[in-house]
């Protein structure tokens, strides 16, 4: 791990565009990419596979400490390939069931502590784009630049609906909206590492913005922060 490698954090709720913008930024800058949400999704999937109760913090923490997961370079559709215990779970961790389960296990303080070092180990030259919910507040509090992407719950539900439809999943948009509102409440009100913008983060509402516009705003901000740091 390189303590001196610059880090840009991108936090925000589900469906705000973090994943897309993070991937584009990492590709544009030629930096490493950390999808922290994928780590929690993998942990949730491992718990489901091993019949571990999602409410059992002790068992989930033990599972987190011994999680056999690898992140490999993927393809254009899935830039990061996720391997759990030798099995490709890149698509499996993107289901709504897995997303909801990830939010539950992520609420446990001991689980977050167990995964903290694993996340920080992604920091390496030439730099890191860290995508998550507490990247700028907890994992990388001294990051070079911090972004917080948000959007209305309705817009995020529509995006998630389109994404899952494209992947062949049968989904109901009203149920998706209800689940997003429920997850927002859980993420924003958990006692440890709640979902909030870092005090020094640039907040971007992506509700009525296209990908190119958000990317340009992010790049301009990052370039400004990095030039000041240097």
From Swiss-Prot:
EC number per UniProt: 2.7.4.25
UniProt keyword annotations, A-Z: ATP-binding, Cytoplasm, Kinase, Nucleotide-binding, Transferase
Enzyme class label: transferase
Gene Ontology CC, one term: cytosol
Main location: cytoplasm
Binding sites annotated in the UniProt record for ATP: 12-20
GO MF annotation: an example: dCMP kinase activity
Catalytic activity: CMP + ATP = CDP + ADP; dCMP + ATP = dCDP + ADP
Cellular compartment(s): Cytoplasm
Domain of life, per lineage: Bacteria
GO biological process, any: pyrimidine nucleotide metabolic process
Pfam families associated with the record: Cytidylate_kin (PF02224)
Family: Belongs to the cytidylate kinase family. Type 1 subfamily.
HAMAP family reported in the protein's UniProt record: Cytidyl_kinase_type1
Protein name: Cytidylate kinase
Organism per entry: Shewanella sp. (strain MR-7)
């Amino acid at each position: 791990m390189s303590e001196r490698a610059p880090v840009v954090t991108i936090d925000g709720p589900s469906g705000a565009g973090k994943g897309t913008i993070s991937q584009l930024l990492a590709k544009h800058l030629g930096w490493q990419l950390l999808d922290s949400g994928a780590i929690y999704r993998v942990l949730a999937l491992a718990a489901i596979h091993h019949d571990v109760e999602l409410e059992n913090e002790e068992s989930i923490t033990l599972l987190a400490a011994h999680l056999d997961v690898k992140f490999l370079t993927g393809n254009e559709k899935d830039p990061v390939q996720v391997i759990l215990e030798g099995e490709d779970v890149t698509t499996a961790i993107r289901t709504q069931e897995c997303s909801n389960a990830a939010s539950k296990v992520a609420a446990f303080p001991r689980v977050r502590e167990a995964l903290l070092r694993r996340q920080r180990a992604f920091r390496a030259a030439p730099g890191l784009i860290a995508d998550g919910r507490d990247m700028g507040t907890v994992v990388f509090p001294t990051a070079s630049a911090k972004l917080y992407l948000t959007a209305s719950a309705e817009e995020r539900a529509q995006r998630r609906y389109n994404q899952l439809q494209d992947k062949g999943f049968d989904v109901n948009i009203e149920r998706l909206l209800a689940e997003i509102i429920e997850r927002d409440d859980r993420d924003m009100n958990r006692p440890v590492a709640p979902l909030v913008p870092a005090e020094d983060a640039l907040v971007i509402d992506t509700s009525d913005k296209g990908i190119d516009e958000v990317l340009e705003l992010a790049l301009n901000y990052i370039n400004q922060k990095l030039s000041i740091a240097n």
